[in-house]
């Protein structure tokens, strides 16, 4: 995928990978900004129920407006590729920060409050995050 252009998104790097798919950094060549693209794996995209769930989750997440939750810009399909276009967040993944060494109590409390606040915002809209991890 690296170096490939899909629709008007030029893929520049891979950010992560999980059970549902792969996330890439890309340039939105129409708007001139960097975004994250979350691709549903081809095997899962062939399952109508999983594809519908992927799309439902993107629509639900798009209803959220919170500083600690990335903004969903859209759902796209190109040929057999299904993906979500999201805000690209700048910063360090929590898992990487944890690997660097112990966090002091003030940092732990600050992070915990931010995470709890984001989850409360989602829960207030009936959304339950089923895959919490420090990434």
Please annotate each region the language model reported.
Residues 1-135:
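Conserved ATP-binding/catalytic core of the eukaryotic-like protein kinase fold
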